[in-house]
Design a protein with these regions (language model features):
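Active-site and NAD+-binding cores of ADP-ribose-processing enzymes
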Residues: 1-176
Length: 176
């Protein structure tokens, strides 16, 4: 990968220096390497299942800018992983939940680039939606995903100290 990335762009490379790093390559491919996101799972995974399963079927993979929130999706007695990742923001619909809970977001309060979410995604005015529904609607409208700011999403399994210890031990990350 390092050698191919050093090739000129017109030869299928990224035009990077010969001693490029994985972070250099990720940045050149458009990933936001300055702002990691985190995914919580009980499974050992090699790739993200973006087709989803159960109630999140079709909604994609879920990430947070805080490692604490994904930790709430891990059952403490089953081990689990908090996986740091990078995403490309250029295809995301960005919404501000204004402090709403993940499953009770007022549709009328959401907008993206000055368009109401009800018009943009075909949601009913006066209704409430969830992160799962927003992601599915956005996918159907051609967005690569959604980024939802100011959202409440803490599960019953929340253990802030456990999440911080895990990230420090496994990845050398010390979250705020």
């Amino acid at each position: 990968a390092q050698r191919n990335a050093a090739l000129p762009v017109n030869q299928g490379g990224l035009g990077l220096a010969p001693d490029n790093t994985a972070m250099d390559r990720a940045r050149a491919m458009g990933f936001d390497v300055d702002n990691p996101v985190y995914h919580g799972t009980n499974a050992d995974i090699e790739s993200f299942n973006t087709s989803g399963k159960g109630k999140t079927k079709g909604a994609g993979a879920f990430f947070s800018d805080s490692p604490i929130i994904p930790e709430t999706y891990i059952s403490g007695n089953q081990g689990g992983n908090i996986i740091p990742a990078f995403v490309k923001d250029d295809t995301l619909a960005v919404f501000d939940a204004k402090g709403a809970n993940w499953n009770d977001i007022p549709v009328d309060s959401l907008s993206f680039k000055r368009k109401k979410a009800s018009d943009l995604l075909g949601l009913e005015k006066g209704d409430y939606t969830s992160t799962d529904e927003l992601a599915s609607y956005a996918k159907d409208k051609g967005f690569g995903g959604v980024k939802i700011k100011n959202l409440k999403d803490r599960g019953a399994n929340s253990d802030i100290n456990r999440a911080k210890e895990y990230l420090k031990e496994k990845y050398g990350i010390t979250p705020n």
